[in-house]
Amino acid sequence: MKKLFIIPALLGAMFLTSCEDFLDVNKSKDSAITTSVDQVLPVATFYASQICYDHAEYGVYMCQALTTGGKSQTGSYPYSQGWEFLGVNRHPMWRRHFYDLGANINKMNEIAEEKGNRNAILIGRTVMLMSTMMTTDAFGAMPLSEVYKSNSPKYDSQAEIYEWMFKEADELLKLYQDPEWVKCPTNLLINQKMDRIYAGDMQKWETFCKALKARLLLRKLPNWKNTPEVCQEIIRVVDDALATWEEPRYYYPGGVTESNCPWGPYAPKINSWESRDNRLDESIPTTFFLHGILGSIDGTYQVSRGYALDPRAAKIMEPRNQISGMLHLESNIGMDINNTIADFPDLLTQSTKTNPWTSNTGYIALMTTEELMFIKAEAQFWGNDINGAYNTTVEATKENMKRYGIEEATLVDHALNQYKRFFEIKLPGAGQFTIADLMQQKYVAMYLQPEQWTDMRRYNYSSSQNGISYAAPGQTPVYVYDVKNVHNGTNALFAKDAANFNKTYSLHRPFNLYEAYWCTPEDYGVNATLSPNAWVNRLNADTETETKYNKKELEKNGYYTTNAAGEKILDYRILKKRLIWAQKNPAVVQCADDNIEWM
């Protein structure tokens, strides 16, 4: 994968000269190309935010929060179409990790080592820890130990990658406590233009590293290593991080191209061919997300009950039709011929400006405060502290509401009643609290965040559709993504009380999936509609580089099968293969079709 080192260096040079003012790179275009730490660091932090967007942009469709008006089985956007991934040309996050981040940060660290800029090395390694976790959680096995040592580096297993990440997190946290590193006399004087996240504040970067360790540890729940000791360690790490926490935000000033937040209306496409611009202007909230999770009320809008049970619904997206309420659509089912995109909510909230993520001058958070709080809540739940898990979930939900400008102390009249009604119906008390309640509220909080799809895969798309349910010992099993308390459609005046929220909506697969991959006998169950193996659990390695330069490693890792003609072809079943943290744990999971072996 030496090519992965040479090519990104050229891309980096092009990038540096294309956004001088934004990234504070002032350099004569006629001078020879040279690189210094203060030039690469702005690029590294920029791409740190960009890879968060890359993963979230795929994930928001894969976890069925958004869809489009189309219904194609195949196309260049398989994650919002029919899941035909093997024909896609490239995955942005693969290239972002190995090219834009890995190559540039490796070069930066080499120079920083020579110059004694140890603070820059710490930042670079922390960013790479984050990026490595995101990338392996999307693709599984991938190059790590030999990544830039040959054109065809070996693929490390996920077990090996996770072992490295845990060691790297612990080593980084020790170095952040070492004065010879954080107070080294030769450290670079880092300002806001070099580091738009923390302006070189090592304590803040250390705190973020603690948060990354908490995210790493969470991968052990609920399947991998679900023990009281792990739960207690997660709680300890989260509490330690929250004590000095400042959300790691990369703010965009607005202007042209990469100066705009990737989720904003400008929809910048970074480096053109290797990226994907956001499609919020042509996307639609799914029935699962808007009607199920957020509790939208179909029919004529009534101010006394609002557009939805969840007050965040009309902040996350902007209602555009009071007569029919907030319209939604099943995933990949296709828009009715009588509808246009203007009939559905504006996901960019261009008039109300109520969604902080979707502004050109918005920000990308490398991790949100709410995520940290929900990590703690999940550890409390599986550690059998149900009261603690409930209380933390309520506080995390309120924290997410604040992000959208919803605070109980500022609400009056119908808005206050709606706020109280939400908690009375969705989170009534610890006695009724389940892991489904927790994860459904985290699902809302992780909208447009990378963890949204990761969470759904950790819980194996648990619903009555695939018969996979979860429960701690002694608890009644629940389907994590079967949403209860869905409005029953009654349109009578004031039909807004708990009695009207009595339906259940189950997560199911998108419509019009690519039949050759997803409509085979192995996709259907006996006691449940779907097999446990009927979902996408990982992405295939980037086809632009890996099938060309590293085919032997792909073969070793199950990417190929032999057809009837004796030819080796890409095997679509790699998409169904679970990652290390999603394997079946009989202690916490039940399956309607227990005789079907999990892939």
Task: Go through the PLM ranges and name each one.
Residues 70-408, 428-435, 595-599:
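Structured, solvent-exposed acidic/aromatic patches
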Residues 1-4:
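Positively charged n-region of N-terminal signal peptides that target proteins for export
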Residues 47, 51, 244, 399, ...:
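Phosphate/oxyanion-binding loops and surfaces in catalytic or ligand/nucleic-acid-binding neighborhoods
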Residues 19-71, 96, 348-352, 468, ...:
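Membrane-proximal, proline-rich intrinsically disordered regions
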Residues 385-472:
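C-terminal structural cap/anchor segments
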Residues 6-11:
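Sec-dependent N-terminal signal peptides
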